Amino acid sequence: MSFALGQRWISDTESDLGLGTVVAVDDRTVSLLFAASEENRLYAKHDAPVTRVMFNKGDTIESHEGWSLDVEDVIEEGGLLTYIGTRVDTDEANVVLRETLLSHQIRFNKPQDKLFAGQIDRMDRFALRFRALQNQYEQHKSPMRGLCGMRAGLIPHQLFIAHEVGRRYAPRVLLADEVGLGKTIEAGMIIHQQVLSGRAERVLIVVPETLQHQWLVEMMRRFNLHFSIFDEERCVEAYADSENPFDTAQFVLCSLDFIRKSKRRFEQVVEADWDLLVVDEAHHLEWNQTKPSREYQVIEAIAEETPGVLLLTATPEQLGHESHFARLRLLDPDRFYDYDAFVEEERQYQPVADAVTALMSGEKLSNDAKNRITELLSEQDVEPLFRIIESSAAEDEQAQARQELVDNLMDRHGTGRVLFRNTRAAIKGFPQRNLNLMPMPLPSQYATSMRVATMMGGRMTDEARAMKMLYPEEIFQEFEGDSATWWQFDPRVNWLLELLKENRNEKVLIIASRASTALQLEQALREREGIRGTVFHEGMSIIERDKAAAYFAQEEGGAQVLICSEIGSEGRNFQFANQLVMFDLPFNPDLLEQRIGRLDRIGQKRDIEIHVPYLQGTSQELLARWFDEGLNAFGETCPTGRAVYDKFADAIIAILATGKSDGLESLIEESAALNKSLKAQLEQGRDRLLEVHSNGGDKAKEIAEQIAATDGDTNLVNFALNLFDTIGLNQDDKGENAIVVTPAENMLVSSYPGLPYEGCTITFDRETALSREDMNLISWEHPMIQGGIDLVLTEGVGATAVSLLKNKALPAGTLLLELVYVVDAQAPKQSGIARFLPKTPIRIMMDGKGNDLSAQVEFESFNRQLSPVNRHMASKLVNSVQKEIHGLIDKAEISMEERLESVRTDAEKEMKAALNSELERLQALKAVNPNIRDEELTQIETQMSELSGYIGKAQVQLDSLRLIVVSHN
């Protein structure tokens, strides 16, 4: 190592000091001035941790005055370098720049410059970088992108709808699944796919006020999508940043009432540029031909300005035909322009539905059915398929022929592309509900206080009195004060304690109407029997509720009981439990269904035990009997319950207000009869064709199986832990498939993407994540992985490395150079480029003669044979073979030109094949189904020509390289 005054060196250990200049040299020491950081360093001369900075022909360098020079020649004189070349700004030739006058703030951007400047990274980081590029590429190419990372069970019909809709350009659809089938999750999956693919960057979700927090939590917990709730306060705050407050966040959640009430806010929402609008509870938007409601007009105005629209609504039959038409009109006003025409068109689908039902049943087709199918599929020769169905062909061949006919009929189904609707009847796997009605004697304390309350409540309406009589513990407290310990004598509490003791190993969900009742019950269970319980009510923050839910979900050491108030339980699901206690009853059938729906959801593995303790001779008994005998509302889902309740509301309220059973028998009889006839109408109106289409059949199962196969990917686990190590995060094993990850002091960056300041608990196991709300499910799509990969690639982690290969079969000192190139097409994310040409890593492995050995030498197995070299030693090795490395890089560049051409050609071919088949299918469909929107076709044509341009301009650049030297030691 020889030093001369004025030479430029860089520190191996403190590269952020910038470019240093030798200012003093004696026999033993050398002194460097780092002007950029105004620091001096004194090093021992024989072993200074510094690397000489030498540039080569073809490099562009910067002078300390700020102008740049393209280097054409390098002359060394008296130990100092002089660079000669052309000035970039003036094109002046033969400009001379001495190394002493180089810029002090030198930045080495190319990996080879970093290597020669001694900025050599660790070998394990080089491997991590290569794996990050590979995994990023594979994720972008995966057809399941956007569906694997959500924290939700793999339920075929949900995945089918999400896969079908999420890949469309600006989807406009109606999701009308029955209660408990997971519409919110379907919507979340669609949003997630649209966001990941870049098709949607700005999303607006409009929901009823009571559901805002539920949506916020669902989107965050399940999909890692962070929405902001906008209300008047938030809008006022946002004025500092933008004239239109809705422009200050990408993902916005707000209530319909908020936009409806303020003309100004409504106008601002319409003006904000959204890519996707999601409306929950869309059945509340009332419409008729002469006078649509204000709510309907608000959503209509936003939907007109927004390319993608998802409407979540109750089932079409519950809505009534006109109301159902109104939803479809929001999605496509050109197509659904006239109600009478729509009714007529629906009538014409009846034969299609009948034909599909006949095919699906597997029975012999009647001549009538065959004629109908032939007529409907007039442009296709269906005779050969009929022959297969009627022949003695193998069963699966017959099934295939039936399926082909069904698929073709489905494509002609008018609303099949815009409407998805699954019913419990069509989706198997729901548990039984077992009702346990528990009559109990009325305590004298309650009887007295109820009698007095009746005498004193002269001015109360019947409805208020009916509500009051359902909750005797509240009446008792009104007289005795808040400290009244009603739970000491209430027989329901004694019965509950026995139930919990008998079922020590079961999780039990208890729901009471009032938060105060829930809190006092928890106290009673704790004080009287030491039962571990937790409470859940509307007075708690989201975080407090999450903690309570996680404590209840915990298998070991968790709470046996979760006691919820009515409002507190909205939108939370606990399908790991199957014991439900209704400590009291809600006032209407919808709330009852909502209670049972906490456990009776898709994914529930066991039958549900519903326990209803009630006090004899009170309104509780009358209401329990009406729910059970009049509606069978405990035994099965009751889509007709609300309609029956509305019809008999006055009679029900009158009976509950008095607590007398006069007229109850006839009320039950009439309710049951109406319920039966309404259910029969629903059954008749069921659109079986739509159900078949919506649940996706075998295709849906295939999607679920494909995703399940990627769960538990050991490659992901190893990569994630390695990534967290490299960044410098603390990882503590927590057992039960869980790891606690927290930020550390010496991290590579000040804050890590997706990781809260206080850290978080992660798991790689879907089942664990589903039962524990406090855990993050780590997948390739999780922000901690996506953000980590971006961090590694942008921060230049692992861009250079030097390793030793201990192999006596090769001569000592043999050189190998491993280069990783990346092909990149510069294109906007929403163009869809990532599907066909994401950043594509190409590895080249050069031997000393310039032969590419990458096909014979696989990365992982080769990497395991290598050992690391310390930085100082690595720097010496690189300097000794700098010339050879330059030669090998030149050869690699030539070979990359050919590779680039083939990558472009393959991407172009794949893109044309995929988009052409999509286009042809839609064009064929358009001929028979008016639901194909013109803009979908033009969008695909435009996308093809744009993508073709982007792919043709794709460039390649060297991303990272590693020098490998053979050693025998």
Curated annotation (Swiss-Prot):
Family annotation (InterPro entries)? Helicase_ATP-bd (IPR014001), Helicase_C-like (IPR001650), Helicase_RapA (IPR023949), P-loop_NTPase (IPR027417), RapA_C (IPR022737), SNF2-like_sf (IPR038718), SNF2/RAD54-like_C (IPR049730), SNF2_N (IPR000330)
Q: What is this protein called?
A: RNA polymerase-associated protein RapA
Locate the Helicase ATP-binding domain: which residues?
Answer: 164-334
Q: Which NCBIfam families match?
A: PRK04914.1 (NF003426)
- Give EC number(s), comma-separated: 3.6.4.-
List positions binding ATP: D177, E178, V179, G180, L181, G182, K183, T184
Molecular function via GO: ATP binding; DNA binding; helicase activity; hydrolase activity, acting on acid anhydrides
According to its UniProt record, this protein's enzyme class is hydrolase
Under PANTHER family, the record lists:
DNA ANNEALING HELICASE AND ENDONUCLEASE ZRANB3 FAMILY MEMBER, SWI_SNF-RELATED MATRIX-ASSOCIATED ACTIN-DEPENDENT REGULATOR OF CHROMATIN SUBFAMILY A-LIKE PROTEIN 1
**Residue window of motif DEAH box:** 280-283
One of its GO biological process terms is: regulation of DNA-templated transcription
Q: What is the role of this chain?
A: Transcription regulator that activates transcription by stimulating RNA polymerase (RNAP) recycling in case of stress conditions such as supercoiled DNA or high salt concentrations. Probably acts by releasing the RNAP, when it is trapped or immobilized on tightly supercoiled DNA. Does not activate transcription on linear DNA. Probably not involved in DNA repair.
Organism from which the protein derives: Aliivibrio fischeri (strain MJ11)
Q: Which family does it belong to?
A: Belongs to the SNF2/RAD54 helicase family. RapA subfamily.
Query: Subunit structure, per the record?
Result: Interacts with the RNAP. Has a higher affinity for the core RNAP than for the holoenzyme. Its ATPase activity is stimulated by binding to RNAP.
Keywords attached to this Swiss-Prot or TrEMBL record, sorted alphabetically, are: Activator, ATP-binding, DNA-binding, Helicase, Hydrolase, Nucleotide-binding, Transcription, Transcription regulation
Helicase C-terminal domain ranges (all copies): 492-668
